[in-house]
Amino acid sequence: GVDKAGCRYMFGGCSVNDDCCPRLGCHSLFSYCAWDLTFSD
């Protein structure tokens, strides 16, 4: 994910990883942001 205004938090709707906030990635099956298993950028 990326640190930008309007980024989606956990379980926020998304279409690509960059829709999500840092350390979150877009879950391909459910189309929401989920933790990408990282602890740092």
UniProtKB/Swiss-Prot annotation:
InterPro entries: Huwentoxin-1. GO terms for cellular component: extracellular region. Coiled coil: none annotated. Expressed by the venom gland. GO terms for molecular function: calcium channel regulator activity; ion channel inhibitor activity; sodium channel regulator activity; toxin activity. It is found in: Secreted. Keywords: Calcium channel impairing toxin, Disulfide bond, Ion channel impairing toxin, Knottin, Neurotoxin, Secreted, Toxin, Voltage-gated calcium channel impairing toxin, Voltage-gated sodium channel impairing toxin. This is Omega-theraphotoxin-Hg1a. It comes from Hysterocrates gigas. The lineage of its organism: Eukaryota, Metazoa, Ecdysozoa, Arthropoda, Chelicerata.
